[in-house]
């Protein structure tokens, strides 16, 4: 059975993510222990809330370097602020440095007129590469659940695995080698979200 380290650095409710991963067949360790993370087959890097708190929580838990190393040697799924933290910086709070694994920045939604920010609720996701194993058995334009005021803007367009429209078209998933990341919350996205988590559990790289 696939053993997944679900990173716990004080950001958000990990219960729903842990239960969803267990539901699709994973053994889950909710942990910030570098030794357990190193032993895991795969890593899920969640995150909700503010980027500054996210970066501070990782640093205080001593797992920022663990994450930097993990993305090069085992399958990683980053979710919401976890995905945003992979880029170089965020506009939040006047500018917050992030992990810098990928070139690019995290931008705040502009004034979208009649559309409210944060972007909260269900929205369609367009898969740039439906053949990617993480999209197995997920229909094009399936709906996923979002809660965010910021979105990622990677410098390399070939990192973009999916997009979404909310007043503007924005990147909602990125991928490179053994890493996949989503702005939406698969653990809150019912059938399509559970399928994506199942695909991650079964993803052989």
Swiss-Prot record:
One of its GO terms (cellular component) is cytoplasm. The active site is at 80 (nucleophile), 185, 187. GO terms for molecular function: glutaminase activity; imidazoleglycerol-phosphate synthase activity; lyase activity. Pathway: Amino-acid biosynthesis; L-histidine biosynthesis; L-histidine from 5-phospho-alpha-D-ribose 1-diphosphate: step 5/9. It catalyses: 5-[(5-phospho-1-deoxy-D-ribulos-1-ylimino)methylamino]-1-(5-phospho-beta-D-ribosyl)imidazole-4-carboxamide + L-glutamine = D-erythro-1-(imidazol-4-yl)glycerol 3-phosphate + 5-amino-1-(5-phospho-beta-D-ribosyl)imidazole-4-carboxamide + L-glutamate + H(+); L-glutamine + H2O = L-glutamate + NH4(+). The keyword Amino-acid biosynthesis applies. Gene3D superfamilies: 3.40.50.880. Residues 3-205 form the Glutamine amidotransferase type-1 domain. The keyword Lyase applies. It is found in: Cytoplasm. SUPFAM superfamilies: Class I glutamine amidotransferase-like (SSF52317). Keywords: Amino-acid biosynthesis, Cytoplasm, Glutamine amidotransferase, Histidine biosynthesis, Hydrolase, Lyase. Its main location: cytoplasm. Its EC number is 4.3.2.10, 3.5.1.2. One of its GO terms (biological process) is L-histidine biosynthetic process. IGPS catalyzes the conversion of PRFAR and glutamine to IGP, AICAR and glutamate. The HisH subunit catalyzes the hydrolysis of glutamine to glutamate and ammonia as part of the synthesis of IGP and AICAR. The resulting ammonia molecule is channeled to the active site of HisF. Heterodimer of HisH and HisF. This is Imidazole glycerol phosphate synthase subunit HisH. The gene is hisH.
